A protein has these predicted regions:
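Flavin-dependent oxidoreductase catalytic cores
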Residues: 1-396, 400, 404-411, 415-416, ...
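Short beta-alpha connecting loops at secondary-structure transitions
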Residues: 268-275, 319, 429-437, 661-668
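Rossmann-like dinucleotide-binding cores of NAD(P)H-dependent redox enzymes
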Residues: 415-455, 526-581
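Rossmann-like dinucleotide/flavin-binding elements
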Residues: 387-418, 461-472, 481-558, 594, ...
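Short, hydrophobic/aromatic-rich segments at coil-to-beta transitions
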Residues: 588-593
Length: 686
């Protein structure tokens, strides 16, 4: 069988796992405020089990004590026996499909917040504040150390009594255990610090207490980093020594390795590598750990496709491959490999929409798979054929909304024609992929191209659809997903009508040549403005990106904005906040941009060759209004049915003519996920 290495069973402790692929611990943000797993939580993991995964380690940063708050990211609370029946539901759901399920347990120490819920006093070995979470903390006392050690043991007991297959102790991401390990955080001079053995003592006592509570038959592992990548942090050689120390105790069944610490904004970007990173960028660190330990080594980080996973396993670098974001993108990945449907796998593109939402306090979603984590609502991963009449469906627009609408309609068995005025599919994805940091996002379009071809959809590329062209096809349903245009006309003094400003699309698509001295004005503060600034600097331009917000890129998530900074600072891009673009005028062969400080009203001028404005998208609505009055439903979507994931009532109502719906940016600008979600939840019942 192809990819045979992925399908070899593995023994971890007393546990046999059916294959070498796992979903590693991550913060899902699906538990309740009280930390109990929900139907959403269970269904999210069960879908991976249905799809054939061998092992899932759930509950990234699940807490063992109430003074390590879990509410901020809705993780699991193992500090109470109330969690046990919830675990039983989760374990049953996974086991009935042949998968194993463990949970990560931890005390976060200083890596949290104190300003809410129980308002706890946070603790760390020496009371040193963490840069990312910014929370102050106290120096943990010896009595508290022993209490927390007991908390770990009781949490492990609850996992075992709940029917889970094991626990993973988090000693990564600067949680309490590895806070004790690190000399830059642990400045203690008592038995819990100082020497190597002193710094290891807390983790050792936790491991001993857990093992004493759960016995030898229950799987216990530890997740560590391979190198903190901090000037005075733990090096790879230090981590090899630590891994060997704990492995040699004989109390660990496995070690999971992550390639970086993450208690600074810069190192946080390493932990969940986005599309700017190469494949498996930290595999060498996991392989280095494997050389010195006698237990299986697990590793995730940018392992996205079966060829890559097979190469890693066949090379003996690690014993199990974590394909965590790969399973967020497609929980049926393993099943599709077995069925010879590799080209149908929806491959993760490293957009990090999932984890960046978590760092913004939101639930984890996938940029391209709108069904992920919505299984409990009835949003399907597998589209079933309709039992109703076959319909003629016309879709206008080949961006993400249009491609998803066409795909789902074809999967339902309908006759689908898609019009796209450009010569290629992709819409704004194609434009975004031209920026230095965003090229891999084109993988979304690649998957749709393969799917639309497989489904036999009538693609009419390079064809602008007008009402006559559409109606000549005698459609039953018309879906408009024809997008919008850059909104440069909001302020007439910007001079868009006179050609004084251009859009980010103009620059990235090559419609205009990059200037040599460029001002980018960005009101959106997401990827588009930062991408065009990075693109221009890459072309050798002198660039200043200005925003009326507090800083450029402020709406970009925590694992992504650092990679922009890494790219743009060396190119000497100037990043300026709190300035509004008032007007642009020509002076000789130069442009003068007049900026006003939001708070002081003081005005500044920039003399440049080019002004690029990123001000979002204005819907293209003319086609909609041309078709609206002739449609049976007057273009209206029943939002109650849409939000409840129910069929549109008009689908079951008889009548002459066509139904009309519009989705994506031709309604209002949102994002790629929103466009795909609207298409899926609208079309799944056609």
């Amino acid at each position: 069988m192809a990819f045979e290495a992925m399908f070899q069973p593995i023994q971890i402790g007393k546990l046999t796992i059916r294959n070498r692929v796992l979903s590693t611990a991550h913060a899902e943000v699906y538990a309740t405020d009280g930390g109990m797993t929900t139907e959403r939580y269970v269904k999210y993991y069960e879908e991976k089990a249905k799809g054939g995964i061998g092992l899932a380690i759930c509950g990234g940063s699940s807490v063992v004590a109430i003074d390590s708050p879990q509410q901020w990211w809705s993780s699991v609370n193992l500090s109470t026996d109330r969690i046990i029946p919830h675990f039983q539901n989760l374990a049953d759901a996974m086991h009935k499909h042949g998968a194993k399920i463990m949970i990560q347990i931890t005390h976060m120490g200083r890596r949290s917040r104190w300003d809410g819920y129980h308002w706890p006093t946070l603790m760390s070995p020496s009371g040193i504040r963490e840069p990312v979470h910014r929370a102050t903390c106290k120096t943990i006392e010896v009595e508290e150390i022993w209490r927390v050690i007991g908390n770990y043991a009781q949490a492990a007991r609850r996992a075992k009594e709940g029917g889970l297959d094991g626990v993973e102790l988090s000693a990564v991401h600067q949680h309490m255990i590895d806070q004790f390990w690190s000399p830059r955080v642990n400045k203690r001079t008592d038995e819990w610090g100082g020497s190597f053995e002193g710094r290891m003592k807390f983790g050792l006592e936790v491991l001993k207490a857990v093992r004493a509570e759960v016995g030898e038959d229950f799987c216990v592992g530890m997740r560590i980093c391979g190198d903190e990548f901090h000037p005075d942090g733990l090096s790879h050689e230090d981590m090899k020594q630590i891994a060997k120390y704990y492995s040699d105790t004989g109390m660990l069944d496995f070690i999971g390795v992550v390639g970086s610490g993450c208690d600074t904004h810069n190192t946080l970007a390493n932990v969940i590598p986005n599309m700017t990173f190469p494949p498996e960028p930290f595999l060498h660190l996991a392989a280095g750990i494997k050389e010195v330990v006698d237990v299986p080594v697990l590793h995730a980080q940018n392992i996205k496709d079966p060829n890559q996973a097979t190469r890693i396993l066949e090379g003996g670098y690690v014993d199990m491959v974590g394909m965590t974001r790969a399973h967020i993108a497609d929980p049926h990945l393993i099943a599709k490999i077995k069925m010879g449907q590799v080209d149908q796998i929806k491959q993760c593109v490293g957009a990090n929409y999932c984890i960046d939402r978590q760092y913004q306090g939101l639930d984890v979603l996938c940029i391209q798979n709108a069904a992920t984590s919505r299984e409990y609502m009835g949003v399907p991963h597998i589209i079933e054929k309709s039992a109703g009449p076959k319909r003629k469906v016309v879709v206008v627009g080949g961006g993400p909304a249009g491609m998803e609408a066409a795909r789902v309609a074809a999967e339902r068995g309908h006759d689908v024609t898609l019009f796209e005025k450009k010569e290629q599919l992709g819409g704004q994805i194609t434009t975004a992929a031209k920026a230095p940091q965003r090229d891999q996002i084109a993988g979304i379009t690649r998957w749709y191209q393969l799917e639309l071809a497989r489904l036999g959809i009538d693609l009419r590329l390079g064809t602008a659809a007008d009402p006559e062209t559409i109606l000549d096809l005698r459609p039953d349903v018309v879906v408009l997903a024809n997008g919008g245009h850059p909104f440069l006309e909001q302020n007439e003094h910007w001079g868009a009508a006179e050609g004084l400003v251009v859009s980010s699309w103009d620059v990235l698509d090559g419609t205009v040549e990059p200037g040599k001295n460029v001002l980018v004005y960005d009101t959106i503060c997401e990827f588009s403005g930062m991408s065009v600034a990075d693109f221009l600097a890459d072309k050798g331009a002198q660039v200043e990106i200005v925003t009326d917000d507090i800083k450029p890129g402020v709406a970009i998530g925590g694992t992504t904005f650092p990679t922009y900074y890494r790219s743009m600072y060396p190119k000497e891009v100037i990043m300026t906040g709190d300035l509004m673009l008032e007007k642009v005028y020509r002076e000789g062969d130069k442009l003068v941009a007049v900026l006003e400080n939001e708070y002081t009203g003081a005005r500044e001028e920039r003399v440049v060759d080019q002004v690029v404005v990123e001000n979002g998208v204005r819907p293209d609505e003319s086609l909609y209004y041309a078709l609206k009055q002739g449609s049976r439903n007057k273009g209206q979507i029943d939002v109650e049915a849409l939000f409840a994931i129910q069929p549109q009532p008009c689908l079951s109502q008889s009548g002459e003519g066509y139904l009309l719906f519009r989705i994506g940016d031709c309604v209002a600008q949102r994002n790629t996920h929103a466009a795909i979600y609207d298409a899926l939840r609208l079309r799944k019942d056609f």
